[in-house]
């Protein structure tokens, strides 16, 4: 096996070690599984879907595990876990294509593997992990396609299919779709407007994604058992019309939630989302979608650095990393949807990891290897610290309830308390 093959296998195994064990706990649907897992079963039973506010692809994939192994907790989480595992080698390939060295790509991949939200989303039957997988796959295929002097039909067709899967999973993939369009134009430049390139661009960015999106609704169309072509055409038109209802739902959603988090607070981890909580006897168990603080708190400055330095030094690799983060994050500020959660930032975090990988690699190259080593150790330590509440491990009540002593400090006219926080709950908003 080649070195690249060994590295890809290694990161996949590392991802699997944290995603497959204990996949059957909790033993019931929790958080949005009450919608997505249930909808997967309904597709299998030919029933109208409970959850229709996202396109069908993710629920159909979740249904694959249920079809094979029954409606069991580990079965409806199996395909999301496999998607989470697959993200690791896909991202390594993407990082290797984008970043200047293999070491930088490994830094970026290890950082992503140690992110808490990425782990939690890989162990729950929700749509987010599939969106990330298909978006990263699409970007990898795009960079491969545009690197050739002449666009190849097979490469552009593969890109179109992957983009279709991303868009038919979550509409938030439109952010990634727009970013990929900019990358395509930036790399191809004038060549993008040649007749052949225009045709292939339309195929991969419009025609095939639209076709895949429509095909994802075929199981829903078939639920009414249409007996003729005319009936199928009517159902297809109904599926198209349904998109207006999806938009209306998100645009006018005025519900409230305990863990609502404004979009501009996400990089600061102001309000992570608790998905599950159980307290019984001497132990507690919980699952919280909390990003690794060392990664999320660094994501904004690292992306600003990549964008600014990339523009100054005319380094398209760094511009790509920084722009990817902001173009997948900032559109949330324009979204009409008001009920949002911090884990939505997950789709932008891989690009922050690319920026961090590039930054760590530069420090290494100038003889400051101690800095990337110390940072990686800190990231790993925080990942292991929060791991019990990323995977619902039993934690003694005494440890959960423990609080470090607080010390009152006078700062001018203000009196603040230093300390008084828990081992896992550093701020009141984390509870």
Give residue ranges: language-model regions.
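Specific aromatic-rich, kink-prone transmembrane helix
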Residues: 44, 90, 130-149, 155-163, ...
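Transmembrane-helix signature of polytopic, membrane-embedded enzymes
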Residues: 5-11, 91-114, 133, 147-154, ...
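Short helix- or helix-capping micro-motifs
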Residues: 12-18, 108-113, 120, 140, ...
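Transmembrane helical bundles and short interhelical boundary loops of multi-pass, membrane-embedded
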Residues: 198-205, 209, 213-214, 218-223, ...
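Transmembrane-helix motifs of polytopic, lipid-linked glycan transferases
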Residues: 13, 74, 78-99, 137-141, ...
